[in-house]
């Protein structure tokens, strides 16, 4: 089982590297994917679908995970390839938002936490809106970590959702734990 997981990780890493190289060389390709941000494969335009399958050449992405990976690729293309160097996982970046922006982020993420990935695109639409909100706050979201999270989103243990919440509140918990249990009179 451990070897299978390692092989899967290598395939995902190899696929993401191909995406980064292709999009880094070709702004037109990035634009094709960017225009389809928030879409699933069945509703995406033909150029984006063709480009995705061409880059997935060796079947690095399983058929079961194609929509999730396509979503992550298109979402990553919301940002320029040269911005990817400062990309951070979704909830890690949110910790740096000011209190009003963080409250708006939390509201959006709470909705996502209870939703399963669906073939109709409801989850994708909600997540796409959250990512566009992040972009408006100058936060670059790491597409590779997003892709891995989406692949594991429906796991029975909900470890992705738990990690998102843990990461979101990690810094706040450290700061607010000072004085917990102290008498303030």
Predicted regions and their residues:
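Extracellular/secretory pathway and lumenal proteins
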Residues: 1-2, 138
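N-terminal "first-domain core" detector
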Residues: 2-9
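Basic, alpha-helical nucleic-acid-binding regions used in initiation and control of genome expression
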Residues: 11-74, 78-185
